[in-house]
């Protein structure tokens, strides 16, 4: 039975470590599906499964636990960054400043509540321990590490602040998710209406394509060419088909418009009214029943060399005699603007003769199998650069310890940048949704299992004996009070969408489990966008403020 003894109890055995993680993750994910009052904790339950196993002595080497924890977190935040990168900067313009101000409010209130409790207990809880509780309450491990480095600079010899962190962390996770749920019921959030509101907000009228059939009624454009009309009108649109005297053809820049001609126009919703008034009037016409010597087809961009090229630079009309009317990216239709940058994974709607469309398909790739091959190089190049950025010390005057973004903040920032600008470096950033979700889920469960196993050994003893319960209570107040206050302000004053607010709360607390819960509630990317919009600034402030408190008050 030596093999069983080694499998169950030998912390240096690879088989034991894999066995332990497999059990903790499987049990946690399974139990996380159980709903209490209609609410389940999802993968967050992996944390508690890890604490339980750690309490009964099932553990692994500390260095291995820390490696798996950090690697899991890196995978999670990097995949989040890749997913939201294309929309990160635009979301910042459309309300990101408001979200970041609200996140700063949460950080400031967390500190205010922590210092208030420190003075309330009048020395019973030492300041370093309260900082440890603060970081557990906001589930921020890099901040805890930075605080420990500051204490080393101050030659601190007191109790390990990680105990306060361990006591506050579990209820910190529960408190953050609980606050999200509480806000939903306090403000009677209608999830269906929030989804519809989100779709309305995300439908950017400048990019969303609008299709209509128009009849030429303006005598001033009769006899003018398509290019002349475009230049005079000053609006961007695509005329993919024209019906003249009962015959349908594909127009080019030299096609002349005549009174009574019927046109199929694709433009942005923003430009549609002006184009309609200028050309004539909108009519009902079934183009499928006309003598149409052409086909319309969605073609998939799969060739890496197309990645990063603008639609106009491809010269589809002049070289192949086809028109591109719209581009579908990640389920959203975009107007075929000549300046639109094509990316691998885009679906391009092409209208033209059968043989011409086939030639365009060959140019773009249109091979679904290519998209099934993961772009491993981009992922690991991004992680490499992210760790490099996260390890870069940022010195501030008067601060003995340089600040760092850490192993979570660095990869997230780099992933966002790669997701947005990777095409300029000829990096293919497309990843199938299933592959992205798989990597994210693996990352988050490894992170949670590691934290739980590591904290489980001393957790019960710390809670039952000494001031453990006090630490738990303080941490819970630090977690909940700021979230409820800022949540109320966000909903009542700023009218923030509930799903975006979920991401804001998770990101301001740098809490991946809360984001994982939010992603289970909705199929939209709003929580992930909200999370990544506030995460970089929140992470920076979390790391900075703990060190500043200790250096200023000790």
Curated annotation (Swiss-Prot):
Where it sits in the cell: the answer is:
Cell membrane
Signal peptide positions (record): none
> What is the designated name of this protein?
Uncharacterized transporter BT_2092
One Gene Ontology term, aspect cellular component: plasma membrane
Decide whether keyword Membrane is in the record.
yes
Organism, by scientific name, is: Bacteroides thetaiotaomicron (strain ATCC 29148 / DSM 2079 / JCM 5827 / CCUG 10774 / NCTC 10582 / VPI-5482 / E50)
Q: Please classify the protein's predominant subcellular localization into one broad category.
A: membrane
InterPro entries to which the protein is assigned, alphabetical: AAE_transporter, RCK_C, RCK_C_sf, YidE_YbjL
- Name a single GO biological process: potassium ion transport
């Amino acid at each position: 039975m030596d093999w069983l003894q080694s499998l169950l109890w030998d912390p240096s055995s690879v088989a034991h470590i894999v066995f332990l993680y497999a059990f903790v993750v499987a049990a946690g994910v399974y139990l996380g599906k159980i709903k209490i009052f209609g609410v389940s904790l999802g993968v967050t339950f992996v944390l508690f499964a890890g604490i339980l196993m750690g309490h009964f002595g099932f553990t692994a080497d500390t260095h291995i636990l820390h490696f798996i924890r950090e690697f899991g977190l890196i995978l999670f935040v990097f995949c989040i960054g890749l997913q939201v990168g294309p929309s990160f900067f635009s979301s910042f313009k459309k309300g990101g400043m408001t979200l970041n101000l609200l996140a700063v409010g949460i950080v400031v209130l967390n500190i205010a509540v922590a210092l208030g409790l420190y003075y309330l207990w009048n020395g019973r809880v030492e300041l370093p321990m309260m900082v440890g509780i603060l970081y557990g309450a906001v589930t921020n491990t890099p901040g805890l590490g930075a605080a420990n480095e500051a204490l080393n600079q101050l030659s601190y010899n007191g109790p390990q602040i990680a105990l306060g962190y361990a006591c506050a962390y579990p209820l910190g996770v529960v408190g953050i998710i609980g606050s999200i749920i509480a806000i939903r019921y306090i403000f009677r959030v209608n999830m269906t209406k929030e989804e519809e509101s989100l779709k309305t907000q995300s439908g950017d009228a400048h990019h969303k394509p609008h299709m209509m059939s128009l009849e030429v009624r303006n005598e001033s454009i009769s006899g003018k060419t398509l290019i002349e009309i475009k230049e005079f009108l000053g609006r961007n649109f695509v005329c993919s088909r024209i019906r003249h005297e009962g015959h349908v053809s594909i127009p080019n820049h030299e096609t002349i418009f005549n009174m009574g001609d019927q046109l199929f126009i694709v433009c942005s919703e923003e430009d549609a009214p002006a184009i309609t008034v200028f050309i004539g009037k909108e009519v009902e016409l079934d183009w499928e029943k006309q003598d149409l010597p052409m086909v319309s087809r969605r073609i998939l961009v799969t060739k890496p060399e197309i990645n990063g090229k603008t639609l106009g630079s491809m010269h589809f009309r002049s070289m192949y005699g086809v028109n591109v009317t719209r581009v579908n990216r990640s389920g959203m239709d975009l107007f075929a603007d000549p300046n639109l940058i094509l990316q691998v994974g885009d679906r391009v709607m092409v209208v033209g003769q059968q043989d011409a469309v086939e030639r365009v398909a060959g140019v773009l790739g249109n091979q679904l199998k290519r998209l099934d091959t993961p772009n491993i190089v981009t992922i690991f190049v991004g992680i490499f650069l992210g760790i490099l950025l996260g390890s870069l010390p940022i010195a501030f005057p008067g601060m003995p310890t340089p600040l760092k973004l850490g192993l979570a903040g660095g990869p997230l920032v780099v992933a966002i940048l790669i997701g947005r600008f990777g095409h300029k470096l000829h990096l293919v950033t497309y990843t199938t949704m299933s592959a992205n979700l798989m990597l994210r889920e693996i990352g988050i469960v490894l992170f949670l299992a590691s934290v739980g196993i590591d904290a489980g050994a001393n957790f019960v003893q710390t809670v039952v004996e000494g001031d453990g319960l006090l630490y738990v209570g303080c941490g819970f107040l630090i977690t909940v009070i700021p979230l409820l206050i800022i949540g109320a302000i966000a909903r009542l004053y700023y009218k923030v969408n509930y799903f975006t607010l979920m991401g804001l709360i998770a990101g301001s607390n740098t809490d991946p489990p809360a984001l994982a819960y939010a992603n289970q509630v909705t199929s939209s990317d709003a929580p992930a966008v909200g999370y990544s919009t506030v995460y970089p600034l929140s992470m920076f402030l979390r790391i900075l403020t703990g060190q500043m408190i200790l250096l200023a008050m000790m």
